[in-house]
């Protein structure tokens, strides 16, 4: 049979409360700590429909009332065949028809930058701000690469506000008309929201 000597008794009396305290502390810590994130079912705007928008974007760089202005450039931008490094800010009308006098349904606001050294390719960061019709007050956010010399192009819709909150989709821009350096671009936009 195991016997506890007189010397071992004080040691055990000190060790047992220490073990008990450690176990208790660990139990309290585990039960009181919370995870850094929590996933809950979203009860808000659930995706339920696909909307097709058709409009024209007026990119006016020349003249007295430009809608697009170059705000920055790299040292070699002007000698680059693709104006690589140019950054332009945009606040352009979005209309129902291809003529600037057509009914304005919104604005294209954002920027684009020449980001391709070999061909005309722009990285576009736009918000289509709708000011008329069913989606008045809503925006759709577009972000992507636009190789403007290609006839078929596709850019992602990555979100929005209002009716387009949590939206996703794509835009199909097609150059409708170019006069000097100004352009009218037809957009077919498909948004799941």
Swiss-Prot record:
Q: Where in the cell is it found?
A: Secreted, Extracellular space, Apoplast
Q: What's in the GO CC field? A: apoplast
Q: Provide the alphabetized UniProt keywords.
A: Apoplast, Glycoprotein, Secreted, Signal
Q: Where is the signal peptide?
A: 1-33
The function of this protein is: Dirigent proteins impart stereoselectivity on the phenoxy radical-coupling reaction, yielding optically active lignans from two molecules of coniferyl alcohol in the biosynthesis of lignans, flavonolignans, and alkaloids and thus plays a central role in plant secondary metabolism.
Describe its assembly. Homodimer.
Q: Which family does it belong to?
A: Belongs to the plant dirigent protein family.
Q: What is this protein called?
A: Dirigent protein 11
UniProt organism field: Arabidopsis thaliana (Mouse-ear cress)
Which gene is the coding source of this polypeptide chain?
Answer: DIR11
């Amino acid at each position: 049979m195991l016997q506890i000597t007189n010397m071992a008794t004080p040691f055990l009396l000190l060790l047992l409360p220490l073990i008990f305290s450690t176990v208790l502390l660990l139990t309290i810590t585990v039960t009181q700590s919370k995870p850094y994130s929590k996933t809950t079912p979203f009860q808000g705007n659930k995706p339920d429909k696909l909307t097709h928008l058709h409009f024209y974007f007026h990119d006016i760089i020349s003249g007295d009332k430009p809608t697009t202005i170059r705000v920055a450039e790299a040292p070699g931008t002007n000698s680059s065949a693709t104006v690589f490094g140019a950054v332009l800010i945009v606040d352009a009308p979005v209309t129902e028809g291809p003529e600037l006098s057509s009914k304005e349904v919104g604005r294209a606001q954002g920027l684009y930058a020449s980001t391709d050294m070999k061909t005309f390719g722009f990285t576009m960061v736009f918000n289509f701000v709708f000011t008329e019709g069913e989606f008045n007050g809503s925006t759709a956010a577009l972000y992507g690469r636009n190789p403007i010399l290609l006839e078929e192009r596709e850019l992602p819709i990555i979100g929005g506000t209002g009716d387009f909150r949590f939206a996703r989709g794509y835009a199909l821009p097609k150059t409708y008309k170019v006069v000097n350096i100004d352009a009218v671009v037809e957009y077919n936009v498909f948004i799941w929201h």
